[in-house]
Amino acid sequence: RVRQDIRATLKFSTTNEFVASFNRENLYIEVARKSDTFQQTIDMLERYKDQSGIIYCFSRKQVDELSSYLIARGYSARPYHAGLEDIDRKKNQEAFIRDDVQIIVATIAFGMGINKPNVRFVIHFDLPKSIEGYYQEIGRAGRDGLSSHCLLLYSYSDVAKLNYFIDQKEGNEKRVAIQHLNAIVRYAEDELTC
């Protein structure tokens, strides 16, 4: 059904249809319960020392705190979020693309149009708002086909935080946000898959 809608909207004939799997065998995907998130992050960074990675955080404040924490400990990291001046955001993004900086700590504002093949890890410091967003964000890892690690740190407090923001919505927007949250929670709590 989705493919039919896309074909109709873009006016493609069925002869132009290519179907591929979302499965990326080079991505090691892990979900871990949050305990000491800063230490869990450091542990991951030590495994991928001097390699490129993205750390996604829920809020600008968390991005600033985590990037400052990492920089103070000698990691090559920069923040990226919509609250930064355009020039700073662009400078941090370009430094990451050029490998002048190894780690970008960002909100979901980061990533659209970025094609950096050598991203070795993606950490979700907080639960994403949707499974679709999560797939898109982890899809930035290992585009060169080499092994990469995707770590989602999960806790019920993340769910409560997202529920708080969902409660501010109304109607269909609220219903869709609840569906998205339920899907990512099911994924994070699925002990057979994760």
Predicted features and spans:
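Helicase motor core with emphasis on the C-terminal RecA-like subdomain
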Residues: 1-179
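Cys/His-rich short segments
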Residues: 176-194
